Amino acid sequence: MLRSLPASLALVAAFASKASAHAAFWDKSMYGFNVTAQTFPYDNRPQVPLYNMTFDQWWFHGHKDYPPNEGDFFELPAGGEVNSIISCDKGATPFYESSPGGDSGYGSNSPCPGQPMSEYHTTGIDDVKGCCMAIAYKPDVNDVQPDDFVVFSCNSTCVWEMNTKFEIPKLPACPEGGCHCAWFWIHSYDSGAEQIYMNGFKCKVTGDVGTQPLGKPAVPRRCGADPDHGKPDPTPGNCTIGAKTPMYWYQREGNNMFEDTYDAPYYNPLYGFNDGAQNDIFMDGVIASLASSGTGSSPTSTVDSSSSAAAASTSYPAQPTSSTQDAPGSSAYPSSSSDSVNSPTTQPYPASSASSTSEAQTTPAAVPTSVATEASSSPIASTTVDEAVVSSSTVGSINPTRSCKPRPSGVAAQKKKRKHARHLHNAH
């Protein structure tokens, strides 16, 4: 029996390693702070990846009914910086005492102490793709919609260390009751399956707060140098400048990004997110080439499709359409309407001309009715929406698991794998 003990311990250690993979933002201000693997019918701990889920399952990680204690806020010092805790395991953070397994490595600055880099989806520091924080100026979590969030800070070397700094722009004060924030991460395509990470938390702006309201956010666009896809030079005219939304990708419904399996969107310069505070968030988001030409001064400007390659939607700049993607996702946020419209897809590879921002044919992006019609008192700059385009998603419930989604097979997928030299032997 004693001989079998080391083998048993090895098995337990291996299981523990697998169970604590992936990463999450950890703070007492977060939703789902005390959620365990047994809270839901499926493993829905904060560090579990999100993919192919219904809107209610991925939005705030499905943790809206597990709020922080009254008065717990993550403080954002206006014009300063803040330290955040990002880890694969709550037990490896300063909050280990409330972890079901207790202390599992606290004291290390690794996001996953004692585990290989594949557990936090990277092959090395050159393979990290960045993460971000976004803010919504609404105190009631049930009022927060996807387009309310504005990305205000990015860290381009994330996930790499447990202690991760975020620079804070001169944000205006939150309303009474505070703001809502969220941490977002999409890892490298060559270090795991296609998925996103989102953890919501209560936050408030402190210190010498600003007075300028945030602009109306627009969807980010692929515009940076992309040598892996034969684009050695950036296409700045294709960037979204100004306030930008987070990137909602690879879900069953609620996507605003439609890149395919091997073209993941990232919170780095490839999508117009520079490292540090996003100090352009005080202007409305708009496609750079349209702004420079004066064609569109704000994302609600209507562009004549007969004279421009880009047509604007009724709320944000239209994204170019492309062929059907492998990623599952409906084109709009859930609504009660029985009507539906086609949603645009983002262009993984911008046109060769810097002045061209999309394909000739575009379709308007659907937005939630509440976003298009709500009169908000938040410091997000108001814009006029000519018409609310509403879509419905009537997708049935699914049964997600914490395991990463298997990759597509077939000749095309295998060619893509070989082309990009994927490192799949330790992927999750």
Curated annotation (Swiss-Prot):
Stretches with biased composition (Basic residues): 414-428
GO cellular component: extracellular region
Cellular localisation: Secreted
UniProt-annotated glycosylation sites, renumbered to this chain: 34, 52, 155, 238
Domain of life: Eukaryota
Leader sequence residues: 1-21
Residues covered by region (Disordered): 216-239, 292-428
Extent of Basic and acidic residues compositional bias: 223-232
Keyword Nucleus: no
EC number: 1.14.99.-
Composition bias type Polar residues, residue spans: 380-402
Keywords, ordered alphabetically: Copper, Disulfide bond, Glycoprotein, Metal-binding, Monooxygenase, Oxidoreductase, Secreted, Signal
Record flagged with keyword Cytoplasm: no
InterPro entries for this protein: LPMO_AA14
Low complexity bias: start-end ranges: 292-379
Molecular function, one GO term: monooxygenase activity
Cofactor entry: Cu(2+)
Disulfide bonds: 88-112, 131-158, 174-179, 181-203, 223-239
Cofactor binding note from Swiss-Prot or TrEMBL: Binds 1 copper ion per subunit.
Principal localisation: secreted
Enzyme class: oxidoreductase
Family assignment from sequence similarity: Belongs to the polysaccharide monooxygenase AA14 family.
Functional description taken from the UniProt entry: Lytic polysaccharide monooxygenase (LPMO) showing oxidase and peroxidase activities that are common for LPMOs. Catalysis by LPMOs requires the reduction of the active-site copper from Cu(II) to Cu(I) by a reducing agent and H(2)O(2) or O(2) as a cosubstrate. Shows no activity on cellulose-associated xylan or any other tested polysaccharide substrate, meaning that the substrate rremains unknown.
This protein's name: AA14 family lytic polysaccharide monooxygenase A
Organism: Trametes coccinea (strain BRFM310)
